[in-house]
């Protein structure tokens, strides 16, 4: 039996775009096959985010994430998804030089991972690249507001779009990406009123992460909402579980039983005549 999921009913970028103004789009990150299966059962988009650099690899930011890392985890997620639309982040340095560089790397991501779309950060200055990719068969999700790959120029992980000038700039960025052909735009860490405004102004779904309730959908880093990543906790994260604490308690119990020679017990060992 093949381990590859049957994808006949898999959502695509066109399906996500058609959800504008309708049922909210549910998106979570996924980086591994087991987590992808869980996300696939309940979500519309499985985002292979470059946040994996921080969450899984212990990097201080997303800037050190490579194409090879994104491909490795993209393949793993694709093995676990049969319904959700798989979107893979383009890592820092893989698309900023121009449309041709972006196409080479986006095409590689799609060919090697089996994803349905790529996501890239940036506003009006990326519109030409988005249009170039879309015209050549590569669906693109945009990302404006707080763009983590630009954290060094933004002065940290701060709320963006406060003040009329900044709000107008970010709204124009989102509109430019939508006009260039992006099928959806992520809005990160914006005042709620700005998230609402952009959602009303552009023709494609907005996916909010710290941008308010009025966005067309929401996304969170799955390790954040499950309580598995505790290095920091953004205000916009709601913890739906505390799996990090549960895992810590389970590992502590295992260690105690091993040291006390209580594990393995009789039910966990093999002997003559015992079933395997």
UniProtKB/Swiss-Prot annotation:
Binds 1 Mg(2+) ion per subunit. It is found in: Cytoplasm. One of its GO terms (cellular component) is cytoplasm. The active site is at residue 188. It catalyses: 3-methyl-2-oxobutanoate + (6R)-5,10-methylene-5,6,7,8-tetrahydrofolate + H2O = 2-dehydropantoate + (6S)-5,6,7,8-tetrahydrofolate. 3-methyl-2-oxobutanoate binds at residues 50-51, 89, 119. Keywords: Cytoplasm, Magnesium, Metal-binding, Pantothenate biosynthesis, Transferase. Its cofactor is Mg(2+). Homodecamer; pentamer of dimers. Belongs to the PanB family. This is 3-methyl-2-oxobutanoate hydroxymethyltransferase. It comes from Paracoccus denitrificans (strain Pd 1222). The lineage of its organism: Bacteria, Pseudomonadati, Pseudomonadota, Alphaproteobacteria, Rhodobacterales.
């Amino acid at each position: 039996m093949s381990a590859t999921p049957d994808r006949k009913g898999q959502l695509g970028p066109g399906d996500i775009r058609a959800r504008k103004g309708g049922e909210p789009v549910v998106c979570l990150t996924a980086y591994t096959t087991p987590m992808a299966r869980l996300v696939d059962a309940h979500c519309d988009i499985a985002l292979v985010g470059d946040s994996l650099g921080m969450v899984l690899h212990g990097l201080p930011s997303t800037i050190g994430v490579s194409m090879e890392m994104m491909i490795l985890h993209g393949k793993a997620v694709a093995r676990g998804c049969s319904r959700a639309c798989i979107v893979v982040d383009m890592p820092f340095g893989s698309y900023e030089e121009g449309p041709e560089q972006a196409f080479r790397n986006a095409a590689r991501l799609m060919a090697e991972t089996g994803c349905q779309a790529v996501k890239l950060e940036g506003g009006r200055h990326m519109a030409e690249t988005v249009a170039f990719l879309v015209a050549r068969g590569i669906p693109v999700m945009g990302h404006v507001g707080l763009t983590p790959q630009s954290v060094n120029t933004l002065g940290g992980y701060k709320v963006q779009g406060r003040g009329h000038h900044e709000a107008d700039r970010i709204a124009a960025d989102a509109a430019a990406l939508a006009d260039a052909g992006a099928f959806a735009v992520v809005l990160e860490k914006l005042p709620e009123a700005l998230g609402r405004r952009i959602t009303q102004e552009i023709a494609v779904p907005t996916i909010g992460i710290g941008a308010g309730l009025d966005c067309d959908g929401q996304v969170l880093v799955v390790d954040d909402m499950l309580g598995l990543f505790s290095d920091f906790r953004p205000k916009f994260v709601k913890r739906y579980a505390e799996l990090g604490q549960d895992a810590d308690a389970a590992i502590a119990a295992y260690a105690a039983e091993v040291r006390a020679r209580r594990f393995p017990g009789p039910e966990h060992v093999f002997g003559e005549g015992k079933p395997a």
